[in-house]
Structures are given as structure tokens and as C-alpha cells.
Amino acid sequence: MKNVEKYLEYAPEVKKAIAEGRPIVALESTIISHGMPYPQNVETAKKVEDMIREGGAVPATIAIVKGKIKVGLTEEELMFLGQSKDVVKASRRDLPLIIAKELNGATTVASTMIIAALAGIKVFVTGGIGGVHRGAQETLDISADLMELAQTNVAVVCAGVKSILDIGLTLEVLETHGVPIVGYQTEDFPAFYTRKSGYGVDYAVANVEELARALKAKWDLDLKGGVVVANPIPEAYAMDEALITQAIDEAVQEAAAKGIQGKETTPFLLTKIKEITEGKSLESNIELVFNNAKIGAELAVALHRLS
């Protein structure tokens, strides 16, 4: 592991937090470059960072800038990622090439988990995780996020899986790999824009202290892999199920008709759904990320107390 440090560059705030042994929360950057339009992307990222600070933890937004892995971003780097058009969506397979070619990369759930683990960060906040795409029986289009959750020791606080995916198969894959699906104050697995997906979670926890004890036990026992912390979107911002289902079905059909596949699929679908819902889906997306940031900060603080 001694060669790792030469690839990582820590923002001053994160460096100080590590030196002082303070709780840190990792954040991904795909949401900035590929998940939301400018300026909402930068505004959301800044507010999420502030919410984590208010919760007693230190935010570390992760990205790659000119081939350097950044653990925590400066304001300039954040603006650059939010506006630049030449930012690669970087998952596990992309990291070595982006570094070697000195490119700019926005980290997905998978690559953020990898970098968080290298930096010793145990809690990561995102909107939703990737999963098994609809029709994967033919295409084998399965997000690398699931394999990462199977092997990397980071807890991922999310609002479940976007219903653009096959949620049932996604949960089956996670079960096969022994990844616990934990509902935060819920028995229902959320579907990103809505509070329920029709599927349950493995366990529900009442508070972050209970969740922190479970994480500590998991990793103390050397049970490798992450945990999905499913935190439903607040009721006030949840979308109407019929409306969002119709929008998603329409977007999925258009993507198929246009032959859109691979890593282009999710950004295309999100943009299309935003159009169809007249911006309501973007508002929901922003609010669920804020809600996850709040719980993520509390969890990082609770886990830190146990160590």
C-alpha cells in the first residue's frame, strides 16, 4: 500500500481532519459532471458539503483532475468539474488509464468507494447506486457498483436504486455477494424518486448508533465488502409513482430506439426523465441527496465514536 499515497492528493480540510482523527464522509463527483446540469450541480455539491460539516463531519468530494486523484476538492476544482465538457465518467476499469493519460474523471459509486477505502474513509454519501439494467438477461449490463459493494469496506448511504434499473435483480446480485441491505428507519427498499419499490430490505435500523455497531462488527469480523444504507427520499419530495413510472418507461423506450447503451445510458435517462417530468425529478434528486448527507454525517460521527 505504500505506493498508493503518491496518487492521492488531499484537500487541506481533509488533510487536517485525517491528522486530527475527525470523521470524514466521502462524496462522488459523477453527480456533478454527469448527474445534474450547471449551476444546480455545483450549488448542490456545495450545500451537501456544508450539511456534512454542520453534522460534525468533514466532506471529501472525490474526483480526478489532470490525472491526480483528489480526496476533497477546492472551490476552483468543483467549478471546473461542474462546467467542463471533457470529464470522463470514471469507474474501476477507468482509473489507471485516466491517471496515466492525465485526464479529468468524475468518480462513480464504484471508484469513489475504492478511493475512499484507500484514504481510510468508511462512509460515503450518494444519490442512488447503480445496478442491473432492464434487459440484462440479454445485454449483461450490470453496474460495476455491485461488484465493488461485494469487496470494498465502505458503507454507502443512498436512496436505493433508480427505478430505471431492474430493482429485483439488483437486490438478488447483492444478496449473492453477501452485501447487507439495511433500511434506515424503513422496512421498504426505496426506489430513489419514491419511498417504496415493492421490495423489502434485509434489516431495518432505528438509529445511526445501531447501524454503526453493525458496521464495526462486520469489519471487525473481516467480512469484506460494503453495506447499502437505504434511506428513503423525504415524503414531501417523493414523486407520484404513476408519473415517475410512466416517465421512466418512456425514457427507457427512447434509449432503446436510439441504441444508447453502456455508461451513456444513465445520464441519457436522467436528462430525459427531467424533461418529461418538467424538472420535478431533478428537484427530488437534489432533496434526496441532502437527506442522505444528513444521515451520512451522523453515521460517520457515530462510527468514529466506536473507534
Swiss-Prot record:
<keyword id="KW-0479">Metal-binding</keyword>
<dbReference type="InterPro" id="IPR007342">
    <property type="entry name" value="PsuG"/>
</dbReference>
<comment type="similarity">
    <text>Belongs to the pseudouridine-5'-phosphate glycosidase family.</text>
</comment>
<dbReference type="InterPro" id="IPR022830">
    <property type="entry name" value="Indigdn_synthA-like"/>
</dbReference>
<feature type="binding site">
    <location>
        <begin position="143"/>
        <end position="145"/>
    </location>
    <ligand>
        <name>substrate</name>
    </ligand>
</feature>
<comment type="function">
    <text>Catalyzes the reversible cleavage of pseudouridine 5'-phosphate (PsiMP) to ribose 5-phosphate and uracil. Functions biologically in the cleavage direction, as part of a pseudouridine degradation pathway.</text>
</comment>
<keyword id="KW-0378">Hydrolase</keyword>
<feature type="binding site">
    <location>
        <position position="141"/>
    </location>
    <ligand>
        <name>Mn(2+)</name>
    </ligand>
</feature>
<feature type="binding site">
    <location>
        <position position="109"/>
    </location>
    <ligand>
        <name>substrate</name>
    </ligand>
</feature>
<feature type="active site" description="Nucleophile">
    <location>
        <position position="162"/>
    </location>
</feature>
<keyword id="KW-0464">Manganese</keyword>
<keyword id="KW-0456">Lyase</keyword>
<dbReference type="GO" id="GO:0046872">
    <property type="term" value="F:metal ion binding"/>
</dbReference>
<protein>
    <recommendedName>
        <fullName>Pseudouridine-5'-phosphate glycosidase</fullName>
        <ecNumber>4.2.1.70</ecNumber>
    </recommendedName>
</protein>
<comment type="subunit">
    <text>Homotrimer.</text>
</comment>
<dbReference type="GO" id="GO:0004730">
    <property type="term" value="F:pseudouridylate synthase activity"/>
</dbReference>
<feature type="active site" description="Proton donor">
    <location>
        <position position="28"/>
    </location>
</feature>
<feature type="binding site">
    <location>
        <position position="89"/>
    </location>
    <ligand>
        <name>substrate</name>
    </ligand>
</feature>
<keyword id="KW-0326">Glycosidase</keyword>
<dbReference type="GO" id="GO:0016798">
    <property type="term" value="F:hydrolase activity, acting on glycosyl bonds"/>
</dbReference>
<dbReference type="GO" id="GO:0005737">
    <property type="term" value="C:cytoplasm"/>
</dbReference>
<dbReference type="GO" id="GO:0046113">
    <property type="term" value="P:nucleobase catabolic process"/>
</dbReference>
<dbReference type="Pfam" id="PF04227">
    <property type="entry name" value="Indigoidine_A"/>
</dbReference>
